[in-house]
C-alpha cells in the first residue's frame, strides 16, 4: 500500500462509526494494510465509564491501543482508512 509507514496519521473507525485520528506505530503487512495504531479518543465521550469507576479515577482515557487493524475503503468499525480531504 503506497504511503503506508510508521508515523502516518490515519482515521480509525470507532464502534459508534465515528472517526478518530490515529498514528500508525507498526506496519504488519504493507500489501493488505494491516497495522498497529494509537488512537486519540474524545476522552470520556468515547470511552464510557461506570459512575463507580469514575469516582475512583476521573481521568478520561485519551488513547487506545488497536492492534492488527485492517484497512477498509468502506469505513467499518475497527478498521482504518486514509483521512478524507476537507
Feature map (PLM): residue ranges:
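Basic/aromatic-rich interaction segments and small domains that mediate binding to polyanionic partners
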Residues: 9, 14-53
Amino acid at each position: 500500500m503506497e504511503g503506508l509507514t510508521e508515523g502516518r496519521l490515519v482515521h480509525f473507525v470507532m464502534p459508534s462509526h465515528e472517526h478518530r485520528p490515529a498514528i500508525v506505530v507498526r506496519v504488519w503487512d504493507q500489501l493488505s494494510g494491516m497495522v498497529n495504531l494509537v488512537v486519540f479518543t474524545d476522552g470520556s465521550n468515547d470511552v464510557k465509564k461506570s459512575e463507580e469507576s469514575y469516582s475512583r479515577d476521573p481521568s478520561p482515557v485519551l488513547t487506545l491501543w488497536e492492534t492488527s487493524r485492517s484497512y477498509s475503503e468502506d469505513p467499518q468499525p475497527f478498521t482504518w482508512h486514509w483521512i478524507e480531504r476537507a
